[in-house]
Amino acid sequence: MKRQSALVVFSGGQDSTTCLFWALKHYETVELVTFAYGQRHSLEIEVAKEIAQEQGLKHHVLDMSLLGQITENALTSDIEIEAEKGEVPNTFVDGRNHLFLSFAAVLAKQRGIIDIVTGVCETDFSGYPDCRDVFVKSLNVTLNLAMAYDFVIQTPLMWLDKAETWALADQLGAFDYVREKTLTCYNGIIGTGCGDCPACHLRQKGLEKYLAEKGDA
């Protein structure tokens, strides 16, 4: 039995698009919310809009440009991507998931939606503290207390590695769609990406592992 409605935090990338198709399977009504936070590649927002339109879903785009004004990182500033071993990579945007989920919750309540779906994942941990299960559970409690509302933050990818995320997309009938139409690349290249940035490496490594396990490599 499908639940009534869900709001998906949506960037147009592999993970959030997989979550979109997961939500379509589990909910009667699905809406999307995308945040414009000053990211270097505004193409991300256009990709999200295009996918939302193709799927016939209501799509909210919220202006969070202030975040790009108060943080300096490789996703909002023109600086080289760095990832030192044992340190948080400079692609981490301080407060991003905290703020995104908080604003998504405000929107969800106004829309009469309880379930918020996000593609954060702890298994392929990239050093991002706001992708941890403990953070999401803590914020869920805080949001419920703050707004006297029974939100449920759904994290269908939390314990999946990238190969398993590809497998889920395949199970949902969305493998080719996710592979060809999503934007994960930090350098703004749709689909296969640049092949050089950390996001592309993680995505491609997971894809190769999944195809090898499936016997399609």
Swiss-Prot record:
Zn(2+) binds at C185, C194, C197, C200. ATP binds at F10, S11, G12, G13, Q14, D15, S16, T17, T18, C19, L20. It is an enzyme of class 6 (ligase). Its EC number is 6.3.4.20. Keywords: ATP-binding, Ligase, Metal-binding, Nucleotide-binding, Queuosine biosynthesis, Zinc. Its cofactor is Zn(2+). PANTHER family: 7-CYANO-7-DEAZAGUANINE SYNTHASE (PTHR42914:SF1). This is 7-cyano-7-deazaguanine synthase. It comes from Streptococcus thermophilus (strain ATCC BAA-250 / LMG 18311).
